[in-house]
Amino acid sequence: MKVISRCDESPAGTAARATVTSRKFGFVAVTIMLAALVSVHSAFAARRHHAAAAAADASEENAASASNAALGAYSEACVLEPTTGTVIFESPNAHAPWPTASLAKMMLMLIVAEKIHDGSLKLTDNVTTSAKAAEMGGSQVYLKEGETFSLDDMMKAVVVHSANDASVAVAEYIAGSTDAFVVMMNQQAAAIGMKDSHYYSVHGLPPAKGQQADVASAYDQAILARELLKYPDVIRWSSIDTAPFRAGTFILRNTNHLVRTYPGCDGLKTGFYDKAGFNVVATAKRNDLRLIAVVLGSQHKLTNFKEASEMLSQGFLNYEIEQVAKKGAPITQSVALTDADTASIKPIWGGDAGVFVKRGGANNGIKVDYNLPPSVAAPVKAGQQIGTANVTAEGKSVATIALLAPSDVAKSSSMTKRLLSIF
């Protein structure tokens, strides 16, 4: 379903409009669903069907707005459970490339987060603003050439305020130039399986004459979001509502309204320019379940937030994580001890395990198989691995979790052994 652009502006005109607008503005899981997916997909689709039916009943004088409603509130969408990568809803064209606008910055976020994780970057690194960065238009924090901020502060400006000048400064700091950084972005996209995407900039601004727009499908944006969620710094940045910048003389305000209005929402990113429409990649967590919702090409500022929140709510209403194992809790079986004063020990779970299931399902085919030895010889150290447990659901392996000794077990003394032999 194709969104209708407000007008076919020139790149310069679009950029000018974008400038004005932007300144205003651990569980392991597996899917158990066949019929379940169909039913929830139908629930998502039903909302769009009812919207189209309502549009058909509209009067002629409201024909234009009714036509827009019939076309749908967005161009494409996708809802994904990140632990398993399960798609629980996608629009028919969820794999079609779509202009990213500032969602392009999500790839910058991923590269930065990975480099912080592997130690090649530090949050305390000083990033200096180049002349090119200082000249950036659109959403910005008005960096001056030569001005220096920590990488952490620059990333807050990128993620919270969608600052184009900070994006350029960070990209240049990492790769030496924005062109070199764009190469890194496309390499990373290919590495994580984004097949319907291509980046031409580090910021996602409307392309100038002769340039091409950054594009990614709704599904690819969900894949990217899934990768981002592996890094705590990303959620720390994207969950910020407001934050001071430049010693409090500038206040960053999150462009993602859902951080303020949707319970459990803590990210991730928004993007807009005329031909891209309003884009949002949102994530929320309730209890043990996290979901990602991508809505691209909305024609009205708040429509994308409304659609994303409704999609998330449908997901939370229909699915849950069924806990199978909790780290530190004892399992139901015991293991015999030899050369010890006690007869046996009951191993504990070495990690958490859960299964992504349809709410209200039967037992969802969940099974736990313990792999334990007949006995273990003392001494035993607390945390020592005793065996493993394999969690399956409908015959598919969900996780293999280590089973650990809950405490130290000393070897029996010679006197104890003699007494035991007597009795």
Describe the role of every protein-language-model region:
Residues 40-45:
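Sec/Tat signal peptide C-region and signal peptidase I cleavage site
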Residues 1-22:
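N-terminal secretory signal peptides that target proteins for export/translocation
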Residues 212-423:
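Domain-terminus/edge residues, biased toward the C-terminal soluble/receptor-binding domains
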Residues 46-223, 228-232:
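Active-site-adjacent loops and short helices of periplasmic peptidoglycan-processing enzymes
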Residues 29-37:
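Bacterial N-terminal signal peptides
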